[in-house]
Amino acid sequence: KLDAARGLNYVAARAADTSDNPRRLVSEAKKVATETAWEAINNAMQIMGGIGYTNIYPVEKYLRDCRLSMIWTGTNEIMNLLIQHEYYKELAAADGEVRDVELDAVGADEVEEKVYE
């Protein structure tokens, strides 16, 4: 799993350098890398037992840092939403629908609110 996460990070970095829209791939790479790291660190914590929570060993710091990385640049749940959004956007573009839903919000503040009764 660690090698797969590392490989996906390299692919995402290349896509960020060369592609116009690497959002889905970058979101997938971040999600997979943080979940894989969390699994590895959680296993290390299980092996260490109660002593793993103390600052005698660096496992507790790795656990805190990993958890922060799962939250800091967007939670993994938000990454799921981004991945789904980009995936469906790619499908819609393949079907010929060219509407960009992100542009819908550009003039939204100028339009009067719709009230449905």
Model-derived regions: residue spans:
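Alpha-helical interface subdomain recognition
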Residues: 1-117
